[in-house]
């Protein structure tokens, strides 16, 4: 377990323990707000915005304050990354694009978003995991921030190589179809995405 990078323990009862060791840096932000506390707080904030996340069961400190452990229930589903690798036809690409759009509409900027962190719970429902690095806006995510955020998961070749079956551009187009703004804004967003994404 590296400092700042959690270790994951999956228990037989399908619950998970996520373990963080405090960074040794004197001025690390984790000293003021430990990652485990951010995880718990973000889970609460995401749930308040009707986003499915794991249910938090417990938060503990071990060895003074140097180690924090969050115990939570595992989401019942499969990551988009695993589905793309094994059953790509099971990925509802249209609903996935709508899901990304809904996060942005709700003012949620999931900085670490990639297809390994998005769980397909059913054909029409998704959930998030590993959301420690999330920023919440009071309104909708601005256009430029949407473009940068949406391009993030498309940088992972292990995912996009599988997504080519359905088409990376198709995923972007499906997202753009949700964007009910002026055509000028739509074109601008598409241009930014094409410059950032490995399409």
Regions found by a protein language model. Name each.
Residues 99, 103-127, 158-162, 172-180:
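Charged, low-complexity C-terminal accessory regions
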Residues 24, 79, 136:
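Conserved protein kinase catalytic core
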Residues 49, 53-67, 108-111, 115-123, ...:
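A cross-family kinase active-site recognition segment
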Residues 42-52, 81-117, 121:
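Conserved kinase catalytic-core helix
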Residues 69-73, 125-131:
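A short beta-strand motif that forms the metal-chelation/ATP-contact edge
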Residues 127-199:
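C-lobe/activation-segment region of protein kinase-like
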Residues 29-31, 84-88, 140-142:
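Short, solvent-exposed loop/turn segments at secondary-structure boundaries
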């Amino acid at each position: 377990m590296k400092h700042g990078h959690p270790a994951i323990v999956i228990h037989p009862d399908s619950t998970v323990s996520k373990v963080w060791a405090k960074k040794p840096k004197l001025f690390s932000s984790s000293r003021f707000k430990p990652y485990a506390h951010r995880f718990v707080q973000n889970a609460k904030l995401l749930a308040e915005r009707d986003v499915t996340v794991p249910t938090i069961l417990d938060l503990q400190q071990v060895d003074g304050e140097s180690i924090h452990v969050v115990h939570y229930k595992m989401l019942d589903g499969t990551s988009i990354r695993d589905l793309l690798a094994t059953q790509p036809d099971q990925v509802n690409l249209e609903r996935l694009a709508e899901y990304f759009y809904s996060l942005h509409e709700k003012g949620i900027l999931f900085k670490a978003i990639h297809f390994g962190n998005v769980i397909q719970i059913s054909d029409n429902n998704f959930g998030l995991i590993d959301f420690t690095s999330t920023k919440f806006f009071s309104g909708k995510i601005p256009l430029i921030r949407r473009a940068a955020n949406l391009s993030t998961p498309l940088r992972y070749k292990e995912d996009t190589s599988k997504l080519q079956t359905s088409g990376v551009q198709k995923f972007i187009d499906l997202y753009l179809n949700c964007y009910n703004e002026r055509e000028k804004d739509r074109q601008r967003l598409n241009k930014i995405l094409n410059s950032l994404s490995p399409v």
